[in-house]
UniProtKB/Swiss-Prot annotation:
Main location: membrane
Residue stretches spanning the membrane: 268-288
PROSITE patterns, alphabetized: EXPANSIN_EG45
Gene: expl6
Physiological role: May serve to lubricate the movement of the cellulose microfibrils during cell growth and wall extension and/or may serve to maintain the fluid state of the slug cell wall.
Protein name according to UniProt: Expansin-like protein 6
InterPro entries: Expansin/allergen_DPBB_dom, Expansin_CBD_sf, Expansin_CellWall, RlpA-like_sf
Gene3D superfamilies listed in its UniProt record: Expansin, cellulose-binding-like domain, RlpA-like domain
Top-rank taxon: Eukaryota
Signal peptide interval: 1-24
Cross-referenced PANTHER family: EXPANSIN-LIKE PROTEIN 3-RELATED, PTHR31836
Amino acid sequence: MIKIIYLIVLLVLLFKNNHIIIKADDCPFPQIPIKTLSGTWYDDPDHASCGFEKLTGPLGPGNRLVVALGSKLFDKGANCGQCYDVTSPFNNKTITVMATDSCHDAGYCQADNHFDFYKEAFDLLGSPSGVISGNSGLSYIKVPCPTYGNVKIMMKDGSNEFWTSFLIFNSRILIKQVSIKLSNSQQFIDLNRQPQGNYWPSTNMVSGEFEVRIESIGGEFIYVKIPSIESRKIYDTGNQFSADGCVGNKYDPYAPFQITSNSNNILPPSLYIIFLISILFLIINNIFSNKY
């Protein structure tokens, strides 16, 4: 009985007020090559609907290998920030591009699988013409984005103590949900993504510190506490979502993200935690066996 009590106390001390570091072992999205990609090009990438502004600015991907997705792929902004490996049938090169905009051409952009490439990216494909048909052999596959550093969050222009809107960027994989816990509440409230965009507005803000919970499409969570609302203020979350199991870009498999103990959706502890608990139990059992 005493051993059981000691074990319970040990578990409480282990998990109370600590972060559980885990990582996903499977790629969080299907990686199925699509070989019916059509393509066109455009020449103004810095005024895109996903909100990343200048591509080489503080919110952008840091390069100009970007695409505007056809309306079906764009999916009202749900695929903002998704990266793709595109393989050309003309020179067999593969380039990695990020979706930063929606394609607005009423003709080409209505195709099921259409990329409107920024000119610099399009030129790398070696196409003999400015339009690539869907039966040319041009193909793509979803991949994690080749980002560096952590997921970041910014509050939109015009944010104030009553209203703000969050842009989540520099993530390896897509964001599924953003939630907020205000200073006068103990519960997280899910936000709705802005239609046709990449911002998550909140219209019921109050003064004081609040917490943002970011969920990836892989079911991982990142938490960040923000002291107050400040227009265009950028916060580094200190963590990055994992992309283990994906083909394409390779990342540090030990890059951590955090799921805090007060989450509404706690995932199972990692094998490391289970192993640690087992070792500690054996130590306690050995101590009491020798003593009694």
